[in-house]
């Protein structure tokens, strides 16, 4: 079947909602720059090659950019976005969306809702927005801003900078050098065997630094717990904090285990 920008291929599914009939369709672009727009029904938009613009609408859409530097907007609904290769910009919009960044230096905005964001190769910028998000950084020097909510951030390869945002967050970043700030909330942060910089932020945090010569800051007058690993770590703490296995401690009266 020939693929063309004007082709509305595949399914004409008739959905009766609020007494109206909605038509769901699949749109497939060309190898050049395309602009594909969804409808009120669940749509599937494929940009193919070229620098494309894909616009979802008010339903649960599937948006795939393909090769090229694409601009993808999910709008309302529970959307699945595959950015594809290239330096893409993705705005998932409201709803509990899933976004795969793909190869290239991508910008991903999760927006309101409990989103799941996957970074891929190259230096991605991943913003969770509001909601309880899950963010996976990958290889490449990624930047993660989890936003507000009880977020979970994972990184098992590559260097990463993480702003966990307000909320009681979990951060596990063990695959490269890490710069992480827990911000407000009672956070749990674990890093790996590299020379990391960790700031707990305002809240009763639990930090496990792993190996490496780490710098850890938990001076916020809250009761934090820090467990240092192999390597020589530098800790800035309060007297109410509990420090385990830490070498170079800068505080007065902290309990050192």
Predicted regions and their residues:
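Glycine-centered beta-turn/loop sites at beta-strand termini
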Residues: 29-32, 38, 47, 56, ...
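Bacterial N-terminal signal peptides that target proteins for export
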Residues: 1-9
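Leucine-rich solenoid repeat scaffolds
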Residues: 218-257
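Disulfide-bonded cysteine-rich modules in secreted/extracellular proteins
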Residues: 27-29, 257
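Sec/Tat signal peptide C-region and signal peptidase I cleavage site
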Residues: 19-26
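Bacterial N-terminal signal peptides
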Residues: 9-18
